[in-house]
Structures are given as structure tokens and as C-alpha cells.
């Protein structure tokens, strides 16, 4: 529990002028050799009614003087204990240091507040479990290169590697330069990995400077392949400024490099280099095919097509193959708007294995008439699509039957026509037709040599006790005229029973 005096000391913000120095001392609001102490707001103190300083600066001063009583007062006023420890370290007051250090968890939290390398080391020594590598790593993070210089001979090659990576990740550029110039580093290429990871052009530039000006070990054996790798990485990440920085030191933007930009749809990188390079037609075509496979945006596809002047004659089949394999229609739509129609060739492939929902969207996107969709479905033996598309056109079964009959007349594909007739007959079975309509359907079957369906509807008519002799005669004339031998035999057989 706080005493009444402590509560007063913590919360008093105003000292009356009439209080004597003796009373102020008894209240514990007096700093030896400085005078009275008064709290000003949350962050400042007033000394001897004259000097205002930050509370943490006052804590550092009190710690340096070893004034435990003033330190406790300022901590009561919510000062930062780290500054008291720094001051105590500066004044070598170890009893106060031990007392204060027991109240904190980690000396490493204090290190960023210290600017003096000697105090930095003394503070780090408070943690008995830490080693030299730990000291150097924190020195690097807190811009204390002199500590690294002092202890570099105490570090193993593995330790040096860790310190170098830490300097790179912490973006301590001066330390990175100094290490690259003065210390043997096992894997210096890590600077480039970190530069790409952090997207840090400065670090990339430092790496190249060390590589070319100081020839840091093991990095000058495969410079060309290293630069090419960096260009590919940068292109794949869309980092044009990285590519331009790399090109200052060598390398070339090859098709392999541009392919990385295409794969990840970085149009700005492509645009920049396509404007400046005269690529062969074949190279542009390969980039376009890659863009289709990568499902790139319309803008990227249009960019590549523009450099081809929208001429795709050489790769038409390859485009269709990519569209089919990767199920992308963006390129088809772009070319369609340019009056280059690839819809027909791809429609058969798509309708062969895609769902009705997908094909409806495809039909709407490219304004394809349902008649074409149904005929193509018939060619590809997709009765399910025939039924669904025809339902979409005609809601009533009889209307649908007449609609499908009209398509048979213009259907040239033999197997497709047979499937349409088969679908029509199934539809006929599912709906009730008048005898006149059944006669018309029988004549339709005769005209198209649909023997099985003709025989079936004739049997249905006979079951209804309807005289079909005249119908058979009429259909026989049709069969003879069109030279349908099997249908002729079927009709003659039926006539023998009439």
C-alpha cells in the first residue's frame, strides 16, 4: 500500500511558494545540488522553479548521480526505468544498477536508447546468458559499427554470415558496405536475396557495387548467370526499377526474362522492353501463347497482339489448343472484336465436355444463336444439352418438338441428325399428339429415313385403331423416291398387316 506521503508525492503538480526548503525535503520533493522538484504534466519536471526538462532526462541524470531517492520519485511519476539504468551505468553505480535491473525483464530493450558504445556494452553485459555474437547483432541493429569492428576477430565464419544477413535485413547500409569491403563473407549473395525479399533497390545497388568494385569472394565466377537470374526474378515480380538497376551492370533482357513478366502478368515491364527491343515474330508469338496459358489480363494480351499487328495465322491452331487446354476465352473474345473468329473451331471442343451453365454463359458472351448450340451438341452426342437448350427456346413440349424438327432439315452431320431425331421421338413419347400431328411426324420420319422411329409411331397409331393404310402408301412413295431400301421393306411389311 502507498503511504499518504507517497500518494501526495505522486499526484502533486503544484508547490506553494510558501513551502520552505525543509518541508520540501521532508516531502521527498528535493534533489540534492539541484533544488525542488515539481511534476509538470505527464512528461516533464520543473527543477527549482526554473528549469523544465523531460522526466526521462531527469531520470538519466539522477541515475548517473546515484540518487536512489530521486530515481524512485521520478519512477513514481511514471518515468521510464530504462533511462535510470542508463544513467546508473554512466555513473558506475552498480548497487543502483542491480536494484533497478531486477525490475525489468530484458536488457536488450534498453539498447536502442543508448548512443555511447561503451555504455552499450556495459548494458549488454547485464545479461549473463548472452555471448559476443548477441552483442554484435544488437550493435548492428542499433548502428554501433565500432563494436563490430572491435569484435570481428572473435566471430566465426558462420557468425559473420549471420551478422551480415542481419545488417542487410536491418538496412544498415554503411555496415553492409564495410563488411563487404573488409570481412570475408561465406555467402555474400544473400544480399541480393534480401534485396528482392525487401524490394530494396539500395541494397541491390550496394550488392552490385561490392560485386564489381570489390570482387567479394565467390561472386565473380558466374556473373552473367547471376545477372540473368536477377533479371528473371525482377521481371516475375514486376520490379522494373530492379531490372533497370541490374542492367547498369550487365545482363540482357532475353525471351526467358520477358517470359517471367508474362507468366505473372506484369504488363508495364513488358511494355517498357517491347518498345525498346525488336523481337522476332516467332518470339512474340511464343510470348502470346504463354500469356494465354497464364490467363493474363486483356491489357497484356492486347499489348502482345498489337506488336503482332493482330496477325495470328501462324499460331491459330496453337491458340485453339491453349484455349481448349486451359479453358480460357479472353483471347477468343479479343480476336472476335477484331473480326477474327475462332468461336466455331473452339465451340465443338467446349460443348463436348462443358456443362450447360458454362455453355449458356459462353453463348451469351459471344452472341451465339441457340440453333447453333443445339446442332453442335448433336454433333458431339450431347443429348442433355439438346434438351436443355431447346427447353430454353420453347417452353411447351409440342413447340419444342416442331422446333427440333425444323433443325433436322438443315442438319448435315449424319450422326447429329440421328441424335436429333432420337431426341424428337423421346419428346413425342412424353407428350400427347393428335392423330393429325402423329401423321405429320410419321411423314417426317419417312423423309429422313428414321426407320425405327417410323415403325414405332405406326405401332402407336395402330394401337389407337387408326387406319394408316393411306399414310403407309404416302410414305412408301417417299421411301421409293429417296431410295430408302430398309424403310421400303418396313412399310411393305406393315402394309401386309393392314
UniProtKB/Swiss-Prot annotation:
It comes from the Viruses. Induction: Expressed in the early phase of the viral replicative cycle. InterPro entries: MGF_505. Pfam families: DUF249. Belongs to the asfivirus MGF 505 family. Plays a role in virus cell tropism, and may be required for efficient virus replication in macrophages. This is Protein MGF 505-5R. It comes from African swine fever virus (isolate Warthog/Namibia/Wart80/1980).
Amino acid at each position: 500500500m502507498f503511504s499518504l506521503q507517497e500518494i501526495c508525492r505522486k499526484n502533486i503538480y503544484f508547490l506553494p511558494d510558501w513551502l520552505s526548503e525543509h518541508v520540501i525535503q521532508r516531502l521527498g520533493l528535493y534533489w540534492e545540488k539541484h533544488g525542488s522538484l515539481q511534476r509538470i504534466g505527464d512528461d516533464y519536471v520543473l527543477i527549482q522553479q526554473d528549469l523544465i526538462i523531460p522526466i526521462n532526462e531527469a531520470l538519466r541524470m539522477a541515475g548517473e548521480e546515484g540518487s536512489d531517492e530521486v530515481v524512485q520519485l521520478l519512477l513514481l511519476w511514471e518515468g521510464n526505468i530504462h533511462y535510470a539504468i542508463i544513467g546508473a551505468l554512466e555513473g558506475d553505480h552498480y548497487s543502483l544498477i542491480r536494484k533497478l535491473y531486477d525490475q525489468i525483464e530484458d536488457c536488450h530493450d534498453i539498447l536502442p536508447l543508448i548512443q555511447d558504445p561503451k555504455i552499450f556494452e556495459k548494458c549488454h553485459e547485464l545479461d549473463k546468458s548472452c555471448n559476443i555474437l548477441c552483442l554484435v547483432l544488437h550493435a548492428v541493429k542499433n548502428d554501433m559499427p565500432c563494436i563490430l569492428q572491435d569484435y570481428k576477430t572473435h566471430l566465426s565464419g558462420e557468425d559473420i554470415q549471420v551478422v551480415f544477413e542481419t545488417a542487410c535485413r536491418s538496412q544498415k547500409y554503411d555496415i553492409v558496405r564495410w563488411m563487404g569491403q573488409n570481412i570475408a563473407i561465406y555467402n555474400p549473395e544473400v544480399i541480393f536475396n534480401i534485396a528482392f525479399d525487401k524490394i530494396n533497390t539500395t541494397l541491390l545497388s550496394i550488392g552490385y557495387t561490392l560485386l564489381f568494385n570489390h570482387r567479394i569472394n565467390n561472386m565473380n565466377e558466374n556473373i552473367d548467370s547471376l545477372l540473368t537470374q536477377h533479371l528473371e526474378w525482377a521481371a516475375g515480380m514486376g520490379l522494373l526499377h530492379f531490372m533497370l538497376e541490374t542492367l547498369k551492370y550487365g545482363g540482357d533482357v532475353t525471351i526467358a526474362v520477358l517470359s517471367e513478366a508474362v507468366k505473372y502478368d506484369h504488363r508495364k515491364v513488358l511494355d517498357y522492353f517491347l518498345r525498346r527491343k525488336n523481337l522476332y515474330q516467332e518470339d512474340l508469338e511464343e510470348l502470346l501463347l504463354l500469356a494465354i496459358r497464364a490467363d493474363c489480363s486483356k491489357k497484356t494480351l492486347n499489348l502482345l497482339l498489337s506488336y503482332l499487328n493482330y496477325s495470328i495465322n501462324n499460331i491459330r491452331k496453337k491458340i485453339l489448343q491453349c484455349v481448349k487446354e486451359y479453358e480460357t476465352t479472353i483471347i477468343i473474345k479479343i480476336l472476335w472484336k477484331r473480326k477474327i473468329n475462332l468461336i466455331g473451331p473452339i465451340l465443338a471442343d467446349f460443348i463436348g465436355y462443358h456443362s450447360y451453365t458454362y455453355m449458356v454463359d459462353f453463348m451469351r458472351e459471344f452472341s451465339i444463336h441457340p440453333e447453333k448450340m443445339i446442332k453442335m451438341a448433336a454433333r458431339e452426342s450431347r443429348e442433355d444439352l439438346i434438351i436443355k437448350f431447346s427447353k430454353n427456346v420453347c417452353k411447351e413440349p409440342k413447340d419444342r418438338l416442331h422446333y427440333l424438327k425444323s433443325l433436322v432439315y438443315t442438319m448435315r452431320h449424319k450422326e447429329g441428325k440421328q441424335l436429333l431425331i432420337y431426341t424428337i421421338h423421346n419428346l413425342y413419347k412424353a407428350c400427347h399428339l393428335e392423330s393429325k400431328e402423329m401423321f405429320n411426324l410419321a411423314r417426317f420420319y419417312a423423309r429422313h429415313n428414321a426407320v425405327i422411329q417410323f415403325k414405332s409411331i405406326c405401332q402407336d397409331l395402330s394401337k389407337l385403331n387408326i387406319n394408316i393404310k393411306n399414310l403407309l402408301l404416302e410414305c412408301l412413295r417417299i421411301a421409293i423416291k429417296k431410295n430408302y431400301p430398309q424403310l421400303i421393306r418396313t412399310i411393305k411389311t406393315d402394309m401386309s398387316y393392314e
